[in-house]
Amino acid sequence: MVKGELLYEGKAKRIFRSSEEGELWVEYKDDATAFNGEKKETLAGKARLNNDISSLIFATLAKKGIPSHFIRRLSDTEQLVKQVDIIPLEVVVRNVVAGSMAKRLGIEEGIALKKPLVEFYYKDDALGDPLVTEDHIAILDVAAAEEVAQLKQMAAAVNNELIELFATVGVQLIDFKLEFGRTQAGELLLADEISPDTCRLWDKDTKERFDKDLFRRNLGNLQEGYQEILSRLGGLYHV
């Protein structure tokens, strides 16, 4: 198998063509960004940590019957994935008030929600990735109503599994962002990554943060926080 031409470069990853049809080569970057790229820094070792954590979580979810684009880890910073057409929606699941929800609604961070909240954001950097309703999604015509229902169902299933996974290692899953894509056959698959870049993760007892808020809010060393998550998960699971 051979890495082909560069197809796309985003804030955190590069996507390459693979010599195998229907597969893509993902390379994680050491770049950390926040506020739609307004804050940016290169942090040595971040690519390896995100690749390892995301590979581990995708492999764990696969064992629980939740399909994703992930095929296998290729190197410290690379993984092989199934080619999908990404749906331009970020699916955010919230278990505890934090981040933009706290700011938007004037609610104190750290308050547990009575039930998980699922939100949709339209992926458009120029618009600032706005929060959208299901009616907005229909107007934008980016996903059919039955697909939106399936996205919510899959997001809820991922939430249940991740809550259990992180609780086992003393970590509280505050909220997280998912992306999904369609295969050529029309199957919806979990895509992108699941890592401290896309999840808020707090120590269950001390509420210490192990996620991108370390960088976003200048709360501490990002690599140390991510390494703590990998070390805790690595004690139980192996890719």
Curated annotation (Swiss-Prot):
Record-level GO BP terms: 'de novo' IMP biosynthetic process; cobalamin biosynthetic process
Xref: SUPFAM superfamilies: SAICAR synthase-like (SSF56104)
Alphabetical list of HAMAP family matching this protein: SAICAR_synth (MF_00137)
Catalyzed reactions: 5-amino-1-(5-phospho-D-ribosyl)imidazole-4-carboxylate + L-aspartate + ATP = (2S)-2-[5-amino-1-(5-phospho-beta-D-ribosyl)imidazole-4-carboxamido]succinate + ADP + phosphate + 2 H(+)
Gene3D superfamilies xrefs: ATP-grasp fold, B domain, Phosphorylase Kinase, domain 1
Similarity annotation: Belongs to the SAICAR synthetase family.
EC number: 6.3.2.6
Primary enzyme class: ligase
Keywords, in A-Z order: ATP-binding, Ligase, Nucleotide-binding, Purine biosynthesis
Pfam families in the record: SAICAR_synt (PF01259)
Molecular function GO labels: ATP binding; phosphoribosylaminoimidazolesuccinocarboxamide synthase activity
PANTHER family xrefs: MULTIFUNCTIONAL PROTEIN ADE2, SI:DKEY-6E2.2
Pathway the protein takes part in: Purine metabolism; IMP biosynthesis via de novo pathway; 5-amino-1-(5-phospho-D-ribosyl)imidazole-4-carboxamide from 5-amino-1-(5-phospho-D-ribosyl)imidazole-4-carboxylate: step 1/2
Species per Swiss-Prot/TrEMBL record: Shouchella clausii (strain KSM-K16)
Name of the protein in question: Phosphoribosylaminoimidazole-succinocarboxamide synthase
Keyword RNA-binding on entry: no
UniProt signal peptide: none
InterPro entries for the chain: SAICAR_synt/ADE2_N (IPR028923), SAICAR_synt_PurC (IPR033934), SAICAR_synth (IPR001636), SAICAR_synthetase (IPR050089), SAICAR_synthetase_CS (IPR018236)
